[in-house]
């Protein structure tokens, strides 16, 4: 494959909802490893997913599943070394970002793809005002002067509904609540009107009411700008009203894909079933809360066969010897279920049983 000759304006820069359309991102057979003194950590093992303009993909899984590492690989912010991407493609609007130079990648990051990190307090510089940090996006990428950039920062703070934005633009991160800091992170991601936003656990450590407000704000802004959104989370409750489709990850692999409401109604993988069963329900007061037994595997020593087999109630001998491929899921009569896939030898028993 020939290398791509990237020029500064080689990736289109749509700025209106009408122009932002079609396939934005294709991740193909992505592998990420970390080389440590104890051995090679296989954090991501052949991940495939895509995101279109205006679409929300939720990437779901426990800690250590590889969901955040995949996002960091897309953004180009993995520490390499010790990280390494031995194979795979990350296509943004058809062009492989893994073949770009650092300078070419920098022009995509922020302007075309932006990321919202889970811990706003540690992501923001504590000794710089939030207005300065928001304005920096415009000074660096748009060449604006400080006064004009500050005006843009106030406009963004208003847009994400931070009260008294003009008075608070000179405040520092510690002077804002957790929910307001997360709004600042959203404003920073939106600054250059990117095509795609990656939100990594954006509601972690926020109370339930603030979580809902932040997710509603993200959904509203996504519709307004027709952006693609990748929502990384371990919380099924967060994605139900926001996502269009879900990719469930376990031990570096995608084990199930489905449109969001289909997955909630009929999971096709025992791991997904376990996650759903562990959600507290108001109609089951007094019942013992289900928990998936055991712990996620050590990525230095991933079990043979299906990585979930030591914890799976349906595991049989084949599960311990053969890695299940992600295959299309169908109805009992063979009718196709669009967007559905499962990496389980016994997906039929799981979804139809």
Where are these regions (language model features)?
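Conserved ABC ATPase signature
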Residues: 171-176, 180
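Short catalytic/signature loops enriched in Gly
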Residues: 18-23, 163-167, 257-353
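P-loop NTP-binding/switch modules centered on Walker-like glycine-rich loops
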Residues: 62, 198-202, 206-287
């Amino acid at each position: 494959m020939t290398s791509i000759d990237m020029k500064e304006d080689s990736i289109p820069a749509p700025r209106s909802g009408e122009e932002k359309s079609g396939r934005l991102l294709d991740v193909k057979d992505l592998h990420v490893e970390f080389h440590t003194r104890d051995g090679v950590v296989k954090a991501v093992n052949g991940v495939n997913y895509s995101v279109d303009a205006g679409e929300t993909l939720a990437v779901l899984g426990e800690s250590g599943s590889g969901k955040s590492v995949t996002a960091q690989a897309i953004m180009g912010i993995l520490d390499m070394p010790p990280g390494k991407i031995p194979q795979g493609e990350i296509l943004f609007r058809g062009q492989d970002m893994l073949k770009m130079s650092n300078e070419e990648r920098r022009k995509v990051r922020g302007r075309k793809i932006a990321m919202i990190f889970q811990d706003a307090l540690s992501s923001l510089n504590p000794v710089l005002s939030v207005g300065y940090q928001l304005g920096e996006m415009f000074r660096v990428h748009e060449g604006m002067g400080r006064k004009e950039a500050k005006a843009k920062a106030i406009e963004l703070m208003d847009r994400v509904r931070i009260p008294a934005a003009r008075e608070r633009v000179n405040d520092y991160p510690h002077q804002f609540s957790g929910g307001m800091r997360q709004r600042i992170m959203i404003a920073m991601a939106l600054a250059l009107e990117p095509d795609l936003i990656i939100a990594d656990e954006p509601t972690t450590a926020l109370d339930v009411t603030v979580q809902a407000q932040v997710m509603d704000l993200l959904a509203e802004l996504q519709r307004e700008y027709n952006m693609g959104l990748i929502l990384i989370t371990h919380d099924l409750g967060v994605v139900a009203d926001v996502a269009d489709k879900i990719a469930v990850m376990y031990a570096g692999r995608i084990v199930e894909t489905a449109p969001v409401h289909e997955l909630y109604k009929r999971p096709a993988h025992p791991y997904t079933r376990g996650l759903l069963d562990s959600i507290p329900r108001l109609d089951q007061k007094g019942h013992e809360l289900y928990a998936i037994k055991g712990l996620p595997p050590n990525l230095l020593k991933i079990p043979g066969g299906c990585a979930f087999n030591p914890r799976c109630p349906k595991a049989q001998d084949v599960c311990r010897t053969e890695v299940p491929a992600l295959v299309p899921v169908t109805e009992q009569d063979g009718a196709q279920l669009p967007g559905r896939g499962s990496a389980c030898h016994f997906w039929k028993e799981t979804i139809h049983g």
